[in-house]
C-alpha cells in the first residue's frame, strides 16, 4: 500500500498537469469545500428543498451542491468523475462545452430533485422531505458523464468476463444504487441525484447540445429505449415517442428535420442533424457497395453489343449537334448544376 501511494500520486499529478483550466478549477473547488467542511457548516451549499423555493430562495445552491462532499470517498468519486470527463469528453467537446454540460446537469439535478421532494411532502406532509433532505455530491454529474460516454463510445468493452459494454453501464449502476437504497445502505438523495443526472444529460445531449452538425444527437443508438433491456425497448420506445409528441405540441421540443442537399444529378447528400459520423460512414459504405454491384450487373449485360446498336450509336453521334450550353461555355469554366435543399420533418425514434 505504501509503495502504491507514491505511484498513484505521481499518476494523478501527471493527469492534472495536462488537464485544462476547467478540470483543475473543478477539482480545486471540490477539495477546498471538503476542507472547509471541517471548519464551518457547509450545509448551506447543498440543495435543501424547503429553502430553495420562496420565500427563502437559496438559488446559489444550484451551483454549489454538485461540488460539495462530506466524506473522503465521495471526494475521490468527484475527482475521478471530473478527471474522466476531462480526459474523454473534453477532447471531443472542448473545455467550454464541458463546463456548460457540467452546469446544465447540476442545475437540472438540483431543480428536479427539489421538485420531487416537494411533491413527496405534498403527498405525505412530512417536513423531513423539506428541511432535512440535502442534495449534494457528484453522483448527478457521474450519471451525465456515463450517458455522454454511451453516446461517444458505447461499444467499448469495460469488462470482458462477463462482457460489459459502456452502453449498459448507466443502467447497471442505477440498478446497483436502487438495490443499495432498498437495503437502506444508501440515502435517497444519492439515488435521486444519479437518476435525474441520467435523465437531464440525455435530454440535453439528445435535443439541445450545439455542434458543427446542428443541434442534438438523433442517432438510433442513442434513443431513450436503448438504455433498457431489449425485451422492454418496444414498450419504452412507444411511451417515449408519445411523450416527445406531447412536448412538440407544447413547443418544448422540435420535430426532427432531415435535409436533402441535391448538388448534382449523380450524387445526393443526405444529412440528419446530430447523427453519428460512424453511422453515416457505415451507411455510405453500404450504399457504395450496392451501387458497385448494380453497375457490375449492368456491365455484364451490355458486354456483347449487337452490330445494329453500334450503327445506331454512330448515326446518332454524327447527326446530333453540339449542345448549346457546351458551345456557349467559355474555355476554362465548368458549369455546375445548382443545388437545392429539401427539408422533411420526421418523427424521431426516442
Swiss-Prot record:
Q: Which residues carry this modification: Phosphothreonine?
A: 329
Tell me the membrane topology, using the record's own terms.
Multi-pass membrane protein
| Subcellular location, principal | Golgi
Q: How does it assemble?
A: Homooligomer. Interacts with COPB1. May interact with LMAN1. Interacts with the COG complex; probably through COG3.
- Which gene is the coding source of this polypeptide chain? Tmem115
This protein's name? Transmembrane protein 115
Q: Which InterPro entries match?
A: Rhomboid-like_sf, TMEM115/Pdh1/Rbl19
Q: Which domain of life does the UniProt lineage start with?
A: Eukaryota
Q: What does this protein do?
A: May play a role in retrograde transport of proteins from the Golgi to the endoplasmic reticulum. May indirectly play a role in protein glycosylation in the Golgi.
User: Where, subcellularly, is it found?
Assistant: Golgi apparatus, Golgi stack membrane
- Name a GO molecular-function annotation: identical protein binding
Does the keyword Transmembrane feature in the UniProt annotation? yes
Pfam families from the UniProt entry: DUF1751
Kindly report every residue range on the membrane side named Cytoplasmic: 1-19, 119-126, 187-350
A GO CC term assigned to this protein in UniProt: Golgi cisterna membrane
Question: Which portions of the sequence form the region Disordered?
Answer: 299-350
Amino acid at each position: 500500500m505504501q509503495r502504491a501511494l507514491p505511484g498513484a500520486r505521481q499518476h494523478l499529478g501527471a493527469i492534472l498537469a495536462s488537464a485544462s483550466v476547467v478540470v483543475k478549477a473543478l477539482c480545486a473547488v471540490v477539495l477546498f469545500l471538503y476542507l472547509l467542511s471541517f471548519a464551518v457548516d457547509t450545509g448551506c451549499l447543498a440543495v435543501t428543498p424547503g429553502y430553495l423555493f420562496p420565500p427563502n430562495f437559496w438559488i446559489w445552491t444550484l451551483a454549489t451542491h454538485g461540488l460539495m462532499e462530506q466524506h473522503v470517498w465521495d471526494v475521490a468519486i468527484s475527482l475521478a468523475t471530473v478527471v474522466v470527463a476531462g480526459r474523454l469528453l473534453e477532447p471531443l467537446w472542448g473545455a467550454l462545452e464541458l463546463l456548460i454540460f457540467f452546469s446544465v446537469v447540476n442545475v437540472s439535478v438540483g431543480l428536479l430533485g427539489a421538485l420531487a421532494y416537494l411533491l413527496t411532502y405534498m403527498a405525505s406532509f412530512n417536513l423531513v422531505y423539506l428541511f432535512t433532505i440535502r442534495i449534494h455530491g457528484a453522483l448527478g454529474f457521474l450519471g451525465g458523464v456515463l450517458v455522454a460516454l454511451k453516446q461517444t463510445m458505447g461499444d467499448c468493452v469495460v469488462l470482458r468476463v462477463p462482457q460489459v459494454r459502456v452502453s449498459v453501464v448507466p443502467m447497471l449502476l442505477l440498478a446497483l444504487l436502487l438495490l443499495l437504497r432498498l437495503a437502506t445502505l444508501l440515502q435517497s438523495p444519492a439515488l435521486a441525484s444519479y437518476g435525474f443526472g441520467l435523465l437531464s444529460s440525455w435530454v440535453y445531449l439528445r435535443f439541445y447540445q450545439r455542434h458543427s452538425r446542428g443541434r442534438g444527437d438523433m442517432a438510433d443508438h442513442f434513443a431513450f429505449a436503448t438504455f433498457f433491456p431489449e425485451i422492454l425497448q418496444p414498450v419504452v420506445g412507444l411511451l417515449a415517442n408519445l411523450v416527445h409528441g406531447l412536448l412538440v405540441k407544447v413547443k418544448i421540443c422540435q420535430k426532427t428535420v432531415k435535409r436533402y442537399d441535391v448538388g448534382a444529378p449523380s450524387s445526393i447528400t443526405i444529412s440528419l442533424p446530430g447523427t453519428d459520423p460512424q453511422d453515416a460512414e457505415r451507411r455510405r459504405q453500404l450504399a457504395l457497395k450496392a451501387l458497385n454491384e448494380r453497375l457490375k450487373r449492368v456491365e455484364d449485360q451490355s458486354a456483347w453489343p449487337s452490330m445494329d446498336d453500334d450503327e445506331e450509336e454512330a448515326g446518332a453521334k454524327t447527326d446530333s449537334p453540339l449542345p448549346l450550353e457546351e458551345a456557349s461555355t467559355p474555355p476554362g469554366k465548368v458549369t455546375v448544376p445548382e443545388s437545392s435543399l429539401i427539408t422533411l420533418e420526421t418523427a424521431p425514434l426516442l
